[in-house]
Each structure stands twice: as C-alpha cells, then as structure tokens.
A protein has these predicted regions:
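N-proximal low-complexity "stem/linker" segments adjacent to membrane-targeting elements
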Residues: 1-24
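Short, acidic, metal-binding catalytic loop of nucleotide-sugar glycosyltransferases
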Residues: 20-34
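Short beta-strand/loop segment that forms part of the nucleotide-sugar
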Residues: 33-44, 59-61
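Active-site-proximal specificity loops/subdomain of glycosyltransferases
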Residues: 46-82
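Short beta-strand-to-loop acidic/aromatic patch adjacent to the donor-nucleotide binding site
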Residues: 84-95
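Conserved donor NDP-sugar-binding/catalytic core segment of glycosyltransferases
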Residues: 102-129
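A recurrent flexible, glycine/aromatic-enriched loop bordering the glycosyltransferase active site
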Residues: 129-149
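C-terminal catalytic/acceptor-binding lobe
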Residues: 163-240
Length: 240
C-alpha cells in the first residue's frame, strides 16, 4: 500500500472550502494507495476548525505572506521525513474530483515521471465556469501546483518553495514548473480535467461575466509586479 501526502497551505479560509478540500482527499484512497492530508497553517488556526477534519495539521504561528510557499516547504519536508511514497499539493479552496489521484497514479506506476492533470474551473461560490483551460497548460508548457502527483524518486528536486522570492510568490507555480523542467524531469499528462479550481482570475470569467467576483485579479497587474522584480538590477544576485 503506497502512502500519498497531500499538502495544503491554510490561511484561515472559509471552513466550508477547506472542509470540501479535505473530504475530496479522503475519498481518493483505494486498495493501491492511501491519501493523507497534511494542512500547514500560515499563522494560527484562529477559529480552531482544523480539529474537525481528518487531517494532520501544523501551525507556523507566523503568517509568512508568500502565497503559501513557506507552508508548502514545511509540509514537503515533513512528508519526506515521514517516508511518504508520493507528494501532492492542494490549495485550500480547490478540491480533487472523483478518481483524480487514481488517474494520475495509473500513469506512473513505474514511478519514472511526474503525473499531471488539467483543471476544471469554478467560481468562488462553486459554480462551473465555461472555460476549458489556460492555453499554456493545454500545450503542456505549464502545470498548476494542485495538479501534480510526484513520486519519491523526485523528492530531492521539489522543495524549492522557500527559495522563491516573496515579491514573485504569485508566480510560484510557474517558477516551480520551470525548475522541474530544468531538472529534465519527464511529465506524464492524464489530459483529464480532474482538479476543481476555484478562480479569482479575470481571464477565466470571459464566458461567465455575470459570475465575476468583485475582488477579481487581473493577470496583467500580477505580471507587471513580477517583471518589475526580475528586471531590477538589485535583485539579480538572487538568481545567480
């Protein structure tokens, strides 16, 4: 029986969101593998809700304000030290759809690559959006952080979360994917949309403008902040 650690950074999101994420993890286990949910609190579990869930939780006491990168790093180290066979990541407002993990597991039974899925898009209220997937994901040039199944063979490559500069944390998934590519790791794609992704990004609402939330994120503004950081001469030594 293989052990899979599913790592979630938690920043006191609505209880119903983390509850759905947690329930989706527990429903994945079968006679080949067991999924265990590790929730790392970015600060403190203010309302003490995690004790209501079937999970292992850990509080960092301080909020690191880096888009969950520090909690992912701590969770990754914990999973490695506890000798898990696979690691996955799941944001607190997302959830695994039926058969998500099994579909990925079947791709890499030889553990010779990292398995990846596509996303299905939902509003923050959980309404299905008419949006297929970002074009770079469909072209296999990007993978969302919540879409990986990573075997133990590749654990030595993956814990870079704490090294990502805080001003670029909104791009952490792209930096992570780029790093894996530099390591020449083989990706295997299920091409199934089995990760349910609640989105605040404007581009995902182009066919459902009536569902667009007030606190929408504009990709161009996020990109501008990241570009400003990367092209600032004072920051170049970070990447040397």
């Amino acid at each position: 029986m293989k052990k899979i650690a599913v790592i979630t950074p938690y920043n006191n999101e609505d209880f119903n969101l983390i509850k759905k994420a947690n329930e989706s993890v527990k429903l994945q286990s079968n006679n080949q593998f067991n999924c265990e949910h590790i929730i790392v609190v970015d600060g403190q579990d203010t309302n003490e809700v995690l004790k209501k869930l079937d999970c292992f939780s850990l509080e960092l006491k301080e909020n690191y304000q880096d888009n969950g990168d520090t909690p992912r790093s701590v969770g990754t180290n914990l999973a490695i030290s506890k000798n898990y066979d696979f690691i996955m990541y799941l944001d607190a407002d997302n959830w695994f759809m039926k058969n998500h993990v099994n579909t990925l597991f079947d791709l890499i039974k030889l553990e010779d690559g990292i398995a990846c899925s596509y996303r299905a898009f939902y509003s923050m209220e959980g309404e299905k959006l008419d949006y297929l997937e970002d074009s770079d994901c469909l072209k296999k040039k990007h993978v969302d952080t919540s879409c990986y199944l990573i075997p133990k063979n590749f654990f030595k490559f993956i814990n870079i979360w704490h090294l990502i500069p805080k001003p670029t944390s909104q791009w952490c998934d792209r930096i992570f994917f780029h790093h894996l590519n530099l390591m020449r790791i083989q990706f295997k794609f299920s091409e199934k949309h089995t990760l349910a992704f609640r989105t605040l990004y404007q581009v995902h609402y182009k066919n459902n403008k009536n569902l667009m939330p007030k606190n929408i994120k504009e990709n161009s503004k996020i990109n501008e902040r990241v570009y400003d950081y990367f092209f600032d001469e004072n920051n170049q030594e970070t990447f040397n």
